[in-house]
Amino acid sequence: MISLNLSPSLNPGLLHKTRTCQQPTRLSALLVTNPKPFNHRHPLGLSPIPNLQIRDVSAKPLLSLTNPESSSGFSRKPRSIAAVGSSDSNPDEKSDLGEAEKKEKKAKTLQLGIVFGLWYFQNIVFNIFNKKALNVFPYPWLLASFQLFAGSIWMLVLWSFKLYPCPKISKPFIIALLGPALFHTIGHISACVSFSKVAVSFTHVIKSAEPVFSVIFSSLLGDSYPLAVWLSILPIVMGCSLAAVTEVSFNLGGLSGAMISNVGFVLRNIYSKRSLQSFKEIDGLNLYGCISILSLLYLFPVAIFVEGSHWVPGYHKAIASVGTPSTFYFWVLLSGVFYHLYNQSSYQALDEISPLTFSVGNTMKRVVVIISTVLVFRNPVRPLNALGSAIAIFGTFLYSQATAKKKKIEVGGDKKN
């Protein structure tokens, strides 16, 4: 075995002595170039020979050129081919890169527009046909159960035909999901009860107060919020109060249903963050599908107990009111399918965009839904009622901005730590 120690101050004579002191080796076992005068570009005195390999017949490397930092005490990082190419690139290549970036931005903008467009459209369709069905069949427990049933069937079809990856279901996951599914059930049925009692626009105005409950419950559980978040909920409270006082179709049951729905969905979100931390591999759509199935198991037995005896006579009244059974079936079917679709789109939108963009989009969604339902059902709106609704929705926008800044600060602090 021949051992060589190369450094910038290598003495060729020392190399000769080292070789003569060792056992004789064959000429093919060693390849060394003749020493040359000191060259500033190559301080080892070696010319740069591409792919020069120095090997011994014994299969062990005779000479290994490693990182200079570990052998000679200095660092010399070679310029990569990509770096050389980029420095000498012509303006045409730079313009091509700029065009590619512009096309990518346009594609993302188009994709974002499609996601938001589908989300808004599906939400509008659900709210319109859900209200149409409830106007002739005022039994929200059955209708809410059917909507969960439609979503459950939809997800089972996707999983069965491998149109969407099926999540790995385990006993710990089901146990962790029991709480969020229960609160989701409470939020969904309460909203349906509210829709059956009052105008859709009024329910959505009251549901815009969800951030108020989120801040209160999260604070009780130990979370802290900056002053800007607390100030942002003031216009929400004021706007909802003004809208409730001036609402033409005011009903205490409708108001209570919307408020309970806020509590249910807030507790669902809080409980999900705490109980599902160990199941982050399950994406939002699969999580919502599992919640829908469990919520159906929660809701339908209670629905039979609450209003099951009224379903048959209520059905006959609904058919008599509409005129044809197919029209009534069409309304109910659309309410169920589009209830799932708009929730599916919301989860997909959340995967594609930032939480801030999502919250702003969700705020604007309420505006679009309120205006659409007012136009479709021709609900009378007083000026003060419209003002209160606008103040409440503006408050939700301020809340989304304030919470987004809070999350940015938290993420920045985590990176520094």
UniProtKB/Swiss-Prot annotation:
GO terms for cellular component: chloroplast envelope; chloroplast membrane; plastid. It comes from the Eukaryota. Keywords: Acetylation, Chloroplast, Membrane, Plastid, Sugar transport, Transit peptide, Transmembrane, Transmembrane helix, Transport. Residues 127-243 form the EamA domain. InterPro entries: Sugar_P_trans_dom, Tpt_PEP_transl, TPT_transporter. Residues 91-102 have a biased composition (Basic and acidic residues). GO terms for molecular function: phosphoglycerate transmembrane transporter activity; triose-phosphate transmembrane transporter activity. Widely expressed. SUPFAM superfamilies: Multidrug resistance efflux transporter EmrE. The modification N-acetylalanine is found at A83. Sugar phosphate/phosphate translocator that transports inorganic phosphate, triose phosphate, 3-phosphoglycerate, xylulose 5-phosphate (Xul-5-P) and to a lesser extent ribulose 5-phosphate. Does not transport ribose 5-phosphate or hexose phosphates. Provides cytosolic Xul-5-P to the chloroplast, where it is used as an intermediate in the plastidic pentose phosphate pathways. This is Xylulose 5-phosphate/phosphate translocator, chloroplastic. It comes from Arabidopsis thaliana.
